Amino acid sequence: MIIFEYKVSPAWLSPDAPESIFRITVTSDKENNVITWFHDKKYLHTIPTSEINKIKSIIKDHSELFRVPECLESNTVLDGEEYSFIFSDGKNTNSFSGFNILDYGRSPRKNATLALRVARTIKEKVLDLNGVRTMIPTRLQRWPKYRKPSNDIKI
């Protein structure tokens, strides 16, 4: 059973294409329960069951993840990256994806920010401590505040 998955892939790929820039999958298996892919190179890791339970409890603490719709936003331009998430606490499971959710100049997306925050927490509290390298961003994107253009031009 997949407990956590974070995947970044080019938005122009078909959904079933195996290529991805980065993917990490954490399962409830006893052996090789953390699988990472960097540009289609597969790496297997084994972490203790207690660490898997920590991931489940982090996800359980953010129960609003299970109410996120399947698609965070539509892909109107086939450009940039697609971000996909799977979260499971052992009982409930939800998966969703979004396109270009880290771009500057776009309005912040509450659900994407929540998912990235939880992924970052899993990275910092479990994966990093067990020596699993990931490409989950450690800092969340900061969107610049909108400023209304001024009619007064100062020269």
Residue map of PLM features:
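Short, well-ordered, aromatic-rich surface patches in folded extracellular/luminal domains
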Residues: M1-S14, R67-I155
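Acidic/histidine-rich, surface-exposed loop or edge segments in extracytoplasmic proteins
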Residues: D29-Y43
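Short beta-strand segments
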Residues: F22-I24, Y43-H45, N92-S97
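Alpha-helical scaffold elements adjacent to nucleotide-binding pockets in ATP/GTP-utilizing enzyme cores
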Residues: F4, V26-S28
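Short, solvent-exposed loop/hinge segments that bridge or flank secondary-structure elements
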Residues: L13-V26
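A short, structured loop/turn motif at beta-sheet edges
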Residues: S28-K30, I47-K54, F87-T93
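A short, polar/proline- and glycine-enriched secondary-structure boundary/capping micro-motif
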Residues: K42-T49, G105-R109
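Charged, amphipathic alpha-helical segments
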Residues: P48-N75
